[in-house]
From Swiss-Prot:
Involved pathway(s): Purine metabolism; AMP biosynthesis via de novo pathway; AMP from IMP: step 1/2
Gene Ontology cellular component annotations, sorted alphabetically: cytoplasm
Residues reported to bind Mg(2+): D21, G48
Protein name (Swiss-Prot/TrEMBL): Adenylosuccinate synthetase
Amino acid sequence: MSASAVGQGRNVVVIGTQWGDEGKGKIVDWLTDHAKGVVRFQGGHNAGHTLIIGGKKTILRLIPSGIMRESTVCYIGNGVVLSPEALFREIEELESAGLQVQNRLRISEAATLILPYHVAIDKAREARRGAAKIGTTGRGIGPAYEDKVARRALRVQDLFDPKHFAERLRENVEFHNFMLTQYLGAEAVDYQQILDESLAFAPRLKPMVADVSAELYAVNAAGNNLMFEGAQGTLLDVDHGTYPFVTSSNCVAGAAAAGAGVGPGRLNYILGITKAYCTRVGAGPFPSELYDNDNPARQDAVGVRLANVGKEFGSVTGRPRRTGWLDAAALKRSVQINGVSGLCMTKLDVLDGLETIKLCVGYELDGKRVDILPRGSDAVAACVPVYEEFPGWNESTFGVKTWDALPEAARVYLKRIEEVVGIPIDMVSTGPDRDETILLRHPYQVA
C-alpha cells in the first residue's frame, strides 16, 4: 500500500549480514504489505529466496519476492545480471501457479545480459580448479560481471538493435571461445545459435523494459514506499567478504543506490537479516563452524542438528550448508559496513531444545584478542573463536508472536547479541510463515 505520509515515501533496504541464506525472502514478503514496489539491485539467478505462504513453498531466484503480492510492482535494476532464459523459466513457473507477472515486472534497460558463453566459462573454470574450486553455482554470474567491468558486456537495451547486437556478440563469442578452447580446454560455443536464441527473447522482453531509475524516483516522489531486496550476504560481497570466496557483486546496502539508480540519501532504513546461528555454502573460512558434510573433521553433533532441524540445503543448488554458532564478531563487521538500522533474527526456533548455546564474541588471532572479523581470508581462517555460553531453553519458540512470550533464556541470548553488535533487534522470525514474526520496531515507521 502507499505511504500514508504526504510527500516522499520511505525506503527500506533488506540485506543479509552473513554468507547468504539468512531468510531474507520471508521478511521481504512480510514487509511488502507496506511497499508499492520491490527492487532487486544486484546478483542474478544464483540466489534463491524461499517463501512459505499458506503452507506452499515457492523459490524465487531472479524475480523480486514482492511478486507474490498482486498489488506490488517489481523492479530488476541495472546492477543485476540477467539471464533471459532463467527469467522466462521463472515467469512461466509463477504464471502456471496463477500469478500475473509480466504486467507487474519492470526491467532496467541497462541490466547486463548473461549469455551461454558466460555459463560455459563458469563451469569450465570450476572444473579446471578441481579441489581448489570456489563453489560457484555455474550459472554465469561471475563471467557476466567480468564483461561488465571490462566494458564488453551486452545489455538488455542492445537486444532491440539486432545489427548492433550481432556485431558485438560476434566479438564476444570470438573472445570467449579463445578462452574456452585455448586455456580452459573446453568446447567452443556456437555464435549463430546464441544470436538466434537471444534475439528471440527481444520481443518478449520489450514490454517489461523500462527506465527503472526514473520510475523509482517518480513512484517515491508520489509518496509511495519502496523496498530494496538484497541477494546473497555481506560476507559474500566482492569487496567486503571473505575474498576470493565471495560472489561477483556488491551485496551490501550501499549497492542498492548504484544498482537501482537511486540517491543514497533516499535509503531511510537498513534491515540486516541474520540467523540465530551461522551457515555457509561452498568453500571459504568459517571461524565458528561446527559441521561440514564434506569434511570428516567437522561433524560436531550440534552442527549436524542445526543442519537437520534448520533444513539447511541450498534452495538453488541443493547443496548441504555448513553450520556453526552465531558469530557476533562477524555480525558486527556487517552492521558497520551496511550502516544497519536494526536486525531481524531468523530461525530462532532451530535452537529450541539445546542444553547450551554458544555465541562467538571475538577471536584469538596471532596471540591477540580481536573483537571484529578481520579483513582477508587468510586472517579469518586463522581466527580461533572466543565464545560466551548461555543456557538453552526447552520451551518451543516456534510461531511465537510477542517478545514476552519468548522463553527468558532466549530473550537473554538476543539481548546479548544486541550488546555485542551495538544495534537493536527489531524483528524476530519464529517460523517460515509470514505471520510467525515478532515485531519490536517497524522498519517503515522508525524515525
